[in-house]
Design a protein with these regions (language model features):
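Domain-level signal for Mg2+-assisted phosphodiester chemistry and nucleotide/NA-binding surfaces
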Residues: 1-104, 155-157
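Nuclease catalytic cores that cleave nucleic-acid phosphodiester bonds
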Residues: 80-207
Length: 207
C-alpha cells in the first residue's frame, strides 16, 4: 500500500521530543517501526519553519539546522517550510507593576495550511493509497474530512505524539497509533552521519 506520511514538525517536537534524549530522530526508521509491513512508505513530508537566532537560546537555530540536514539524507523525505512572524502584543506581566506590558511574540505560521493543502493535492493526484498524519492539531480535521468525503478509496491514519488523539481527528482516521519512548529509542540517527560529498553531520552536543 502506497503510504505518504505528513509530519507537523513542531507538533511532533512539543508533543514528544522536547525535554527528552530522542530529538535526533530518524523519521524513516520511526514510521517503518510503527506501521504494519503492508505500508510501503513512498514519501515523508515534513512541515516546519526555520528558527531565528534568539537571545533566549542562541544555538537553537544551529541545532535545528543540523537536524534538517540529517533529515535531508533520507531519500524519500521532503521538507516544506512555513515561517515565523514576529509581532508586538500586550500581555499581563508575571510580576506587576505594571500589570500590562508590551512584548515581542514569535508565532509559527503556515505549517498547518501547507500540510492540509499537500494532503488534499496528493489525494487529487493519486499519490497515495494511505495518508498518515503525524499531529494532534485539531485544525487538520477539515482537510481529513474532505479527503474522506471526496476520495472514499483513500485510507487515513493518525499517529499522535503521546496522549490521546483529538476526537475531531480520530473520527476521520481509519486507524490511530501513539508514539511512545520505545518507538523513539529505536529510531535515532547515529551520532555521526556521513555524506558522500558534503561534510559529515554530527548530533548537537546539547541534545
Amino acid at each position: 500500500m502506497r503510504t505518504t506520511i505528513y509530519v507537523d514538525g513542531f507538533n511532533l517536537y512539543y508533543g514528544c521530543l522536547k525535554n527528552t534524549d530522542f530529538k535526533w530522530l530518524n523519521l524513516q526508521v520511526l514510521f517503518s517501526h510503527i506501521l504494519a509491513r503492508h505500508h510501503s512508505i513512498n514519501r515523508i513530508c515534513y512541515f516546519t519553519a526555520v528558527l531565528r537566532k534568539s537571545e533566549h537560546d542562541p544555538r537553537a537555530h544551529l541545532r535545528q539546522k543540523a537536524y534538517l540536514n540529517a533529515l535531508q539524507t533520507l531519500p524519500n523525505l521532503e521538507i516544506h517550510y512555513g515561517k515565523f512572524l514576529r509581532h508586538q502584543v500586550r500581555m499581563p506581566n508575571a510580576n506587576p507593576p505594571p500589570k500590562i506590558v508590551e512584548v515581542f511574540k514569535m508565532e509559527e505560521k503556515g505549517s498547518d495550511v501547507n500540510l492540509s493543502v499537500h494532503l488534499l493535492n496528493d489525494a487529487w493526484k493519486d499519490r497515495y493509497d494511505c495518508a498518515v498524519l503525524v499531529t494532534n492539531d485539531s485544525d487538520m480535521a477539515e482537510a481529513m474530512r474532505l479527503v474522506k468525503k471526496g476520495f472514499n478509496n483513500k485510507k487515513l491514519a493518525l499517529i499522535t505524539p503521546r496522549g490521546r488523539p483529538t476526537a475531531g481527528l480520530k473520527r476521520y482516521a481509519d486507524f490511530a497509533k501513539t508514539i511512545d519512548d520505545a518507538d523513539l529509542a529505536v529510531a535515532q540517527f547515529p551520532y555521526r552521519i556521513k555524506r558522500p560529498v558534503a561534510s559529515d553531520i554530527y548530533k548537537p552536543q546539547s541534545w
